[in-house]
């Protein structure tokens, strides 16, 4: 009680009562402390006794083996973690079965219902009893097989795991089975389909080849897992993403995903042998992404591969020795620096398996971080092929992870290659253009445009009347520069009346520098025009040295004059006289072996002598088949585009593939190949049985030309088709048997000796590219349906239009060759060649092809297939240049 001594004394008058109070307080405190200590000691003793008893009880428990049912359920929980895991296992089984069509139907994110159907090899009846048992597979027999495993599955756990956490049904049929069989499974064993039935054996039923697996009530016997996966929307999104990934990696397989009861699929790819990964990516993720994809390939056997879409890979900076040591190949589709999204899309397949690689994903994200804005992400699809001996697939229960030999070095190579390509693409920018023509969205010109024209004409008349009556009338509104149209489709330029420079090497300078003219695509073996190219091969090096077009007429406006083209020195020395008629006549002569010639190959020279006609009136056709074909394209005319082609003004050519034209205040880009093909198709039908003729001064052997065409990769000839000489002989006889029809209706003249005498003149003053003559004859013999009248005429006209159309591919290559010559030879002569070629070509397009567009009946498809694309308007240009 020492602490009481420190307290101040109580101020009280009764000392006895104070002493009694102090004694009472002291006694109470002492009793309370004693009671608390006693209770604490009792609690501690009880806890110690309980823990000791628990330890004694635990030590008495024996180690025992888990039942097989418990083991299977635990294993199933590891393999099948959510519906998307189950679908992944089933998809890989379908692909292992060589399926070409896979259809998936889901309900509630796959928790309530998940069904997958394929057209693969199916399951044999004798295997259906054990198909859902654990560790049963047809893909692995011993552990060493893992080193060379090629299939997706190998453990035999997928169906077993699914059957332990759901109600599983299988309907399957093999190709040699007379019917399909249906069976139900639970916990890896066959089970009766309903409580009323006792037999669990597979039941025969109707079905198609392949397998249909239905999973119902997933995780019905594991409530904890089912409660975790309550978000069915998230589970469905995972399934959609999974289907997209497998669809991209297997473009030849058709993948279909839809919700139960919904007829419209959410994922649908067509598949087929011609389907490519880029096409699938475009259909699933949109064309905005597919246009910006870079195809990157790494192959130790081909360090400089050529990719599709001109995405060529420069492998000079890759160390081939290290690449060979790593022993892997890669093909990837990477978005360029012009594309980014808020969410990253990283898809990785290694030896066909969908796997994750955090290291590779992080490494590539670091590469893209230098080029993309902060907070945006790229699209990456990577397919790695590694020798099975260098990869361990037995790492993760869900097979989502693998281990690769030299993984760090492989990732480093991929990072380096992607960085190289992105640094190149970062220097360019892609701008989208509008394909649909504004104002031409409907078949007819908009009424507002017509009203505007009518109002303009009426206002003009009113103004003129008012001005005559009242000179002091109000002033006309000011016309701003940006609204003024300075071009007129009815006006003509001086160059239309001048003979243009010949673009076919028929001038002295081109003879000196470009090996002369002639059909450079084929070698003249025996020196005769009739056997031009006989037994020879396609000569791509001489592809540009051709007389591919008709020289433009010098006096095109004089209907009575015959026009002779410009000739080279050698041509003037060996000029031959040719009689011209009212038809267009092409004379073919061979060039002599002059010492001045720089090669020993004789080339076929073409000279065109033209007697222009006045406005043609087409001959009335009485054949029903031709009338039907004409009415088909006339009834499908886009009126807006019809006005467009009537009033557009030629601006210039772009790479000879496209031309720039102005219509009103807008600038358009038109596809010359598509439009000229349609033009010559329609002109061929309108000129049916009334063609002029282009004749050769020396007949050409059809057999020899067919042999040349069969040597071309364009022919598609394979060894299984038979010997080329026999094919050429058969096709020659076929064309000879049809010579009366071809001559009477299409002016394709063939004599009894199997020689080509002439071809039709579809458009006045225009001669097609003779490079295509062998292929034209081949297609004419093989692609035409000769048995039926309408199909026969349509097929012939189609091949004629393909023969006469503007071919941009050859012209691009020709300009490339000329540009290369300019780089090595900076003389004025070489520069003039390039000018001559482009100037002559543009003259042909501007003054022969473009006027014919007024006769065109443009189909409606031209409005949205890229044939006509709006580039800009005067208003937009005025904002930039402040003048027009």
UniProtKB/Swiss-Prot annotation:
Region annotation (Disordered) ranges: 1-21, 297-318, 442-522, 544-605
GO terms for biological process, alphabetical: mismatch repair
Biased composition (Low complexity): 446-472, 577-590
Molecular functions per Gene Ontology: ATP binding; ATP hydrolysis activity; ATP-dependent DNA damage sensor activity; mismatched DNA binding; MutSalpha complex binding
Chief location: nucleus
GO annotations of cellular component type: MutLalpha complex
Bias-annotated ranges (Basic and acidic residues): 473-489
Function: Heterodimerizes with pms1 to form MutL alpha, a component of the post-replicative DNA mismatch repair system (MMR). DNA repair is initiated by MutS alpha (msh2-msh6) or MutS beta (msh2-msh3) binding to a dsDNA mismatch, then MutL alpha is recruited to the heteroduplex. Assembly of the MutL-MutS-heteroduplex ternary complex in presence of rfc and pcna is sufficient to activate endonuclease activity of pms1. It introduces single-strand breaks near the mismatch and thus generates new entry points for the exonuclease exo1 to degrade the strand containing the mismatch.
NCBIfam families: mutl (TIGR00585)
Protein name, per record: DNA mismatch repair protein Mlh1
């Amino acid at each position: 009680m020492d602490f009481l001594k420190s307290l101040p004394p109580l101020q009280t008058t009764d000392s006895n009562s104070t002493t009694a109070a102090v004694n009472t307080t002291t006694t109470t405190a002492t009793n309370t402390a004693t009671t608390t200590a006693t209770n604490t000691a009792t609690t501690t003793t009880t806890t110690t006794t309980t823990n000791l008893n628990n330890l004694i009880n635990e030590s008495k428990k024996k180690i025992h083996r888990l039942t097989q049912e418990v083991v299977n359920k635990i294993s199933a929980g590891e393999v099948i973690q959510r519906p998307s895991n189950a679908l992944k296992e089933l998809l890989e089984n379908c692909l292992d079965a060589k399926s070409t069509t896979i259809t998936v139907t889901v309900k509630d994110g796959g928790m309530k219902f998940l069904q997958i159907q394929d057209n693969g090899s199916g399951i044999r009846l004798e295997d259906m009893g054990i198909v859902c048992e654990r560790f049963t597979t047809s893909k692995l027999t011993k552990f060493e097989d893992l080193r060379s495993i090629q299939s997706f599955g190998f453990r035999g756990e997928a169906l077993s795991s699914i059957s332990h956490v759901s109600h599983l049904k299988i309907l399957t049929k093999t190709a040699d089975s007379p019917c399909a069989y249906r069976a139900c499974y639970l916990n890896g064993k066959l089970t009766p389909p309903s409580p009323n039935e006792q037999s669990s054996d597979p039941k025969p039923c109707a079905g198609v080849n392949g397998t249909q697996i239905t999973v119902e009530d997933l995780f019905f016997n594991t409530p904890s897992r089912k409660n975790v996966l309550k978000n069915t929307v998230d589970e469905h999104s995972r399934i959609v993403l999974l289907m997209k990934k497998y669809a991209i990696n297997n473009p030849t397989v058709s993948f279909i995903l839809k919700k139960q009861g919904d007829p419209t699929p959410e994922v649908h790819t067509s598949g087929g042998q011609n389907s490519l990964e880029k096409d699938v990516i475009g259909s699933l993720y949109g064309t905005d992404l597919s246009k910006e994809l870079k195809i990157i390939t790494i192959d130790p056997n081909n360090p400089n591969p050529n990719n599709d879409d001109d995405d060529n890979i420069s492998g000079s900076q890759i160390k081939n020795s290290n690449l060979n040591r790593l022993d892997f190949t890669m093909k990837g589709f990477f978005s360029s620096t012009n594309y980014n999204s808020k969410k990253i899309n990283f898809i990785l397949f290694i030896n066909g398996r969908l796997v994750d690689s955090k290291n590779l994903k992080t490494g590539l994200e670091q590469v893209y971080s230098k080029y993309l804005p902060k907070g945006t992400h790229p699209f990456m699809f990577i397919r790695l092929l590694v020798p099975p001996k260098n990869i361990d697939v037995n790492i993760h229960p869900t097979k989502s992870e693998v281990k690769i030999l030299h993984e760090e070095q492989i990732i480093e190579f991929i990072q380096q290659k992607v960085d190289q390509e992105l640094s190149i693409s970062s220097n360019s920018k892609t701008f989208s253009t509008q394909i649909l023509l504004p104002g031409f969205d409907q078949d007819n010109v908009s009424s507002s445009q017509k009203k505007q024209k009518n109002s303009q004409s009426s206002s003009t008349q009113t103004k003129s009347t008012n001005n005559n009556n009242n000179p002091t009338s109000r002033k006309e509104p000011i016309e701003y520069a940006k609204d003024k149209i300075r071009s007129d489709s009815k006006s003509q330029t001086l160059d239309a009346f001048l003979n243009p420079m010949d673009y076919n090497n028929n001038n002295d300078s081109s003879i000196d520098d470009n090996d002369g003219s002639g059909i450079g695509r084929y070698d003249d073996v025996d020196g005769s025009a009739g056997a031009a190219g006989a037994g020879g091969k396609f000569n791509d090096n001489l592809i540009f040295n051709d007389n591919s077009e008709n020289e433009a007429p010098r006096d095109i406006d004089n209907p009575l004059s015959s026009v002779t083209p410009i000739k080279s020195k050698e041509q003037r020395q060996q000029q031959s006289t040719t009689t011209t008629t009212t038809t267009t006549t092409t004379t073919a002569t061979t060039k002599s072996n002059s010492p001045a010639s720089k090669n020993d190959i004789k080339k076929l020279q073409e000279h065109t002598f033209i007697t222009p006609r006045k406005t043609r009136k087409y001959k009335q056709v009485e054949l029903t088949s031709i009338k039907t074909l004409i009415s088909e394209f006339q009834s499908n005319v886009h009126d807006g585009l019809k006005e467009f082609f009537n009033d557009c003004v030629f601006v210039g050519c772009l790479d000879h593939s496209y031309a720039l034209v102005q219509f009103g205040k807008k600038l358009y880009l038109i596809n010359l190949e598509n439009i000229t093909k349609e033009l010559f198709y329609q002109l061929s039908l309108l000129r049916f049985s009334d063609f002029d003729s282009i004749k050769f001064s020396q007949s050409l052997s059809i057999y020899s030309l067919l042999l040349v065409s069969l040597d071309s990769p364009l022919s598609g000839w394979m060894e299984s088709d038979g010997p080329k000489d026999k094919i050429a002989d058969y096709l020659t006889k076929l064309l000879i048997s049809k010579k009366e029809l071809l001559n009477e209706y299409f002016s394709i003249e063939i004599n009894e000796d199997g020689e080509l005498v002439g071809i039709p003149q579809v458009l006045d003053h225009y001669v097609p590219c003779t490079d295509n003559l062998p292929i034209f004859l081949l297609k004419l013999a093989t692609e035409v349906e000769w048995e039926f009248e309408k199909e026969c005429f349509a097929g012939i006209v189609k091949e004629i239009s393909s023969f006469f159309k503007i071919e941009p591919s050859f012209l691009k290559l020709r300009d490339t060759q000329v540009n290369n010559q300019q780089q090595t030879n900076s003389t004025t002569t070489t520069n003039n060649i390039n000018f001559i070629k482009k100037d002559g070509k543009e003259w042909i397009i501007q003054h022969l092809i473009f006027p014919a567009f007024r006769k065109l009946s443009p189909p409606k498809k031209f409005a949205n297939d890229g044939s006509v694309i709006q580039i800009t308007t005067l208003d937009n240009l005025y904002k930039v240049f402040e003048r027009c």
